[in-house]
Amino acid sequence: MAKLYAVGDIHGSTAHLTRLVETVPFEPEDRIVFIGDYIDRGPDSSGTVEFLLSFRERFPKCVFLRGNHEEMLENFLNGADGCMGDAYITNGGGETLISYALNPLGKVKAADFPEGHLGFLFETALTHGEDGFLFVHAGIRPGVALEDQSRQDLLWIREEFFTHEHALGLTVVFGHTPLRDVFQNPPYAIGIDTGAVFGGMLTCVELGDGKILNAYQV
């Protein structure tokens, strides 16, 4: 029987990701939802993306959500306001560029990245709903209907979401805000960013019946 999993923020921590995949009994038919922030801050963003591309071939039912760091990289490459100059670089983007052998102080363009990497990062979804769960990188704005949620909130919201109840009728599984352990506020929210890049653990949870069935941390 297929299982439902969610994996927290990786942030270029390929070593954590490799150990996690060796630990969790994933099967090809399982749904595995990655919560976003594959890049930035950690030492090996390029290796993480390459690993996930290969992983997707073996586990085709994966879902990859967009995190705010994928959003920042896209804005940086497009020259969008708010992510010019040092803004992206100082928020962990410098480590990503270095992992691709690019100079953070130089001119960087999309063509400098390996084929398929940016497509993978930028074709990510904002949300995924399944089996009574809503998966999203940062969270939702309580009191706002799902179809009216802003992109900003889905990618960036923090305490305004997970310290409050909501009326979506779904358990929201989120990352983005690094916490010392898995956050549980049933039936409203489950937080799975446990700060792998900050010396914490990388977390994967198996989900069902509105709750965590099993948790794996490396």
Give short role names for the model-derived ranges:
Residues M1-F51:
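N-terminal active-site segment of His-dependent metallophosphoesterases
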Residues R41-A125, F161-T163:
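Active-site neighborhood of divalent metal-dependent phosphoester bond hydrolases
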Residues G129, F135-H137, C204-G208:
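Short, well-ordered beta-strand micro-motif
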Residues V144, S150-Y216:
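Conserved beta-sheet core of the metallophosphoesterase superfamily
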